[in-house]
Amino acid sequence: MSAALDYPTTRYDPAPLVDLSARDERARLTESALRAFFNIMATWSIRDADARALLGGVASSTFYDYKRNPARVLDQDKLTRISYLIGIFKALHILHGAELADRWVAMPNRNRIFGGGSPLDYMTRGGTPAMQTVRRLLDARRGGG
């Protein structure tokens, strides 16, 4: 006979899941996501062509329109990409000092995932799956995955 175990409780309510398929939710998140994206790109000194690739290959005119007027509604893919980049930025700043954290994405890396290239090259070529891999790698390094 086994004793029933009580599931641990917490006094905190779980955060609601973000539903990026809902237009209202995307509208709520887009402006701050774009501002964060452009701040990260500036901090990392990323060229506009690479920044456009990180967003999924948007046209130059669209990219500069995002920069001038972030009050819009991005699609789920772009918000997911930005979310990964924000997580990568945060993880790097947890793991490293600011100078290395802000240079890391553009530096050659011997990790076999990157094959001697930079994480930036890997992410621009590999898109969302590559961003997820980099995010998971960094989360694992900081003990979160």
Annotated model-derived regions:
Residues 1-145:
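Non-transmembrane "mature" sequence context
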